[in-house]
Amino acid sequence: MATVYDVPADLLIKRVAERLKDMVAPPEWAKYVKTGVHKERSPEQDDWWYLRLASIFRRVYIDGPVGIERLRTFYGGRKRRGSKPPKFRKGSGAIVRNALHQLEQLGFVKKTREGRVVTPMGRSFLDKVATELKSELVSEIPALEKY
């Protein structure tokens, strides 16, 4: 059985986002916000919430136990400040927090004393998606079978 580590991250995130579209709805305010103070505009993709949700889910799987502040740092970026030199700024805490709440309501993530961790149900969900994705990739590229 393949795990999250065995498949490309971009393909896995897209596939998990498609699955999560049936399970959750983005908050009302999601269409009006930027993803952080370092951004000048809001996301152009209509389904950006599901992609961020899937990305956070994968991050918790890989890095867990992880907290909101560490995830904010991961999704941060360089803030342009005009003629002054750029500085790093963290990403939006509300987006990370609400995404984690949605994953907790689905039963995929739980809160512990050290931070958020993936539950066995969440690990099973991600591993099943990774296994399906890997079998499709092996049929396209037979050389991947040895991994």
UniProtKB/Swiss-Prot annotation:
Gene3D superfamilies: Winged helix-like DNA-binding domain superfamily/Winged helix DNA-binding domain. The keyword Ribosomal protein applies. Keywords: Ribonucleoprotein, Ribosomal protein. InterPro entries: Ribosomal_eS19, Ribosomal_eS19_archaeal, Ribosomal_eS19_CS, WH-like_DNA-bd_sf, WH_DNA-bd_sf. The keyword Signal does not apply. GO terms for biological process: ribosomal small subunit assembly; translation. GO terms for cellular component: cytosolic small ribosomal subunit. Pfam families: Ribosomal_S19e. Transmembrane segments: none annotated. It comes from the Archaea. GO terms for molecular function: RNA binding; structural constituent of ribosome. May be involved in maturation of the 30S ribosomal subunit. Part of the 30S ribosomal subunit. Belongs to the eukaryotic ribosomal protein eS19 family. NCBIfam families: PRK09333.1. This is Small ribosomal subunit protein eS19.
